[in-house]
């Protein structure tokens, strides 16, 4: 039994048309799904490549003196533009972990958000469009756009509190561990006070 279980856990999840058809019917805008060993072109990007893109865009922001596309939070408080420019990744950090170690030594709770990761390298754009094209065949096109963002930090809670995203979200861990606390949609509807709160101790048992 143990051997069979181990074999099952190591099996890869292929995001083919059969998968997307089932996903659209059973999960899309209905409930969350956690997958292991996913086979996707998006995962071709290594953490070192992502770091290089991050530094490239950070250099662009410093040159333009405009951190648009980046957001930085400490203890849940959003930093102003001047502060953001001071804490962006640098080539001397050498890696995502190197940047994290530098920020971790300065801030007990921080979160860096970058929503423009692919804007500086069009050669990687196809990785996102290949992924979304397969999805759109089964759920239709969005009325706005798709983007690839990066969240990096040591934050214990999302900087803007408990929330419902106004779009579909796919999360791929790049380095380290990412945890989510989720509530059933029906529970959230019955408890609107959950929205944007940081104090949800009494609701934890229902998550």
What do the PLM-derived regions correspond to, one by one?
Residues 2-26, 40-47, 51-207:
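Active-site region of the double-stranded beta-helix
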Residues 28-30:
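Anionic coordination/interaction segments
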């Amino acid at each position: 039994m143990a051997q069979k279980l181990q074999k099952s856990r190591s099996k890869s999840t292929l995001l083919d048309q059969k998968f997307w058809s089932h996903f659209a019917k059973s999960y899309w805008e209905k409930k969350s799904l956690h997958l292991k060993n996913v086979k996707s072109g998006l995962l071709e990007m290594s953490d070192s490549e992502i770091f290089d893109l991050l530094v490239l865009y950070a250099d662009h922001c410093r040159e333009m003196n405009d951190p648009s596309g980046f957001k930085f939070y400490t203890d849940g408080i959003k930093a102003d533009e001047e502060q953001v420019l001071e804490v962006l990744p640098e080539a001397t950090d050498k890696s995502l972990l190197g940047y994290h170690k530098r920020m971790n030594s300065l801030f007990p709770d921080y979160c860096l958000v970058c929503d423009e990761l692919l804007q500086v390298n069009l050669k990687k754009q196809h990785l996102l469009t290949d992924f979304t094209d397969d999805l759109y065949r089964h759920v239709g096109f969005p009325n706005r756009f798709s983007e690839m963002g990066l969240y990096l930090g040591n934050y214990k809670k999302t900087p803007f509190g408990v929330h419902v995203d106004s779009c579909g979200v796919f999360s791929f861990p790049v380095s380290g561990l990412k945890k989510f606390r989720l509530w059933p949609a029906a529970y959230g509807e019955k408890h609107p006070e959950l929205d944007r709160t940081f104090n949800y101790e009494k609701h934890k048992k229902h998550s």
